[in-house]
Every structure is written in C-alpha cells, then in structure tokens.
Amino acid sequence: ACEAEDTPSCLSEDESATLAKWRQGPQSQDGTQLYPGGIPEGSEPFWWLWLTGNAQGAGRLVPAFNTDFGRYMAFPTDPGPAWTPAEFDFETDPARLATMAEVYNGDSPDLSAFRAAGGKMIGWHGWADAIVTPYKTVDWYEKAAALAGSEEALKENVALFMVPGLDHCGILPGPDGISATALDPMTPLETWLAEGTVPTSIMAQ
C-alpha cells in the first residue's frame, strides 16, 4: 500500500484490502471458505474486461452479468429488477443458491460411470481466468481423484491441464499470446482414444 498520497501507480490501504479479498475468495463472517479460491494472480492483464473497466469505458462485464443473474436466475424466487449484488448476504444467500445450482451446474466429481464405460476426458482451465476461478477446477479434480481411489486411477480416464496466462475461455490472448484458438486438446484426445496414448501435454500454437 502507498505510504504517501494515493496515485494511479500505487494502491491505497483500502484498495489493497479489496485486492486481498479478491485473492482469498468469498468467505462467511466466521472465515468459512464459501467457494474454492479467489481471483488468481496472473489474471491482471484481463481485469479491464471483466472487473475494472478501462479509461475508455469498455469492459467491466462481471458486474453487469452478476446483476442480471442475481435478479432473474440465481435464486428459487427472483428478487426482481431492483436487486443489486451489494444486497448479497454471504451468511444466508449461499444456501439459497443451491436450488438453481442443481439445474445449472455439471460439476459432480463422481466419474465412476464414465470411467467404467472406458471414457476419456481432457479438461483444461486458464490460470489467468479472472471470473471462473481455476481453483474450483483444481478442487473438482482433487475430489474426483479421491472418489476414484487415487490420482493415478483417475489419470486412466481424465487428464487435466492448467494453462498459464490463459484468460477466461481464452477469449483474449494473454501476454504470451495464448488464446483458446491456440490450444488443441482434440488431437491428443483422439490419439488417446485410438492408440491408448495418455496425453502429457497440450500444444499451443
């Protein structure tokens, strides 16, 4: 934080505190983690699009999305057009999200039927995803490994690749130029299915 006056190149104490909360992810008042992880380090090049906006007034898509999602899709009973994200109650509202989560989410870590059928899956997530935290995917993978008996058992059917510098869905190219169009998970998946060669990498063009 700035020890002198606040400037565009230095964070105030309040700004630093906000950033720390972004990093830690949502918690209840007693410190219970409500969702795995927060906004990852390395996602800063994409904040203008999703979180902060830029000097030209572009970006800042997450607040707009969260507002309408909360009004009309998040809860069993829609709170309506007057609701704002500032009204979200971290003590009571997470439980209220569970009903619609059953409709929207496809994140069960129980892959027993998939594995028994001989299925193969390649998953990937960008480490620089500022809006769907990659820590959730890591958490899902760890739970899937536990249910499979071990990570080695899970690897017979599932390969997960965490991509440094990759934005949410690879929409914007990062500083290293990687975007979703640069990744090719299909070729190693097809090779895995046809030849039984377990993928150890995904090539980025």
Language-model-detected regions and their locations in the chain:
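C-terminal His-loop and adjacent cap/lid subdomain of alpha/beta-hydrolase
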Residues: 1-205
